[in-house]
C-alpha cells in the first residue's frame, strides 16, 4: 500500500513548520516497509536531513513555494491534490495540519487527520485572523474531521472535548502526544533564576510563541 503525507505548509517560523520538519527527519531513523510519498514545498528541503532524502522508500513530491500561502494551499488541497493522489495509486493519506481533502473518501483514499488544537470550538474569539477567515477555517476543520477515517488528537482531554462538541464516535479518535526537540529539552537547575523568580526546584518551561491563543497566564 502506498502512503502519502501532506507537508505542504507555511514556511513561517511556527509550531506547524517545526512539526513537519521534525517528522520528516525522524523518518530517517525508521526501517520503512512501505513506500511513502511526501508532498512538501521546495523551501522545506534546506531543513531536511540529507539522510532521509536518500531513503529509497521515500519519494519527495516537490511543490512550488506559493502553496505555502494559505489561500492557494487550500485551493490546491481540495481541488487538485486528491486527484493527484488517485492517479499515483495512493490508498492512505496522512494530513498532519488540521485539514484534509474533503473528497478523498469518495476516491477511496483513507485519511488520517491530526488535529493540533480545539481552539476554534473552545475559544473562537482568540483565533488569529479576521472573523470571516476564522469562520471558514472552523467549518473546513469540522468537515475534515467528519470525513476522515481516523482522527489523531494531542491529549485525552482534547479527545473527550472534541468528541462531545462534534458528536464523534470515540473509537474514531486516537491520542498521540506532541513531542519536543531534544535540543530544547534538558534537566538543569540554574540557582540564580530559581532564586530570582521564586521557582520551586521542579518546574516546567514551556517554549512557545507569545500569542494570545496560547493562553499564557502571567
Which residues does each PLM region occupy?
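Carbohydrate transferase catalytic cores enriched for Leloir-type hexosyltransferases
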Residues: 1-218
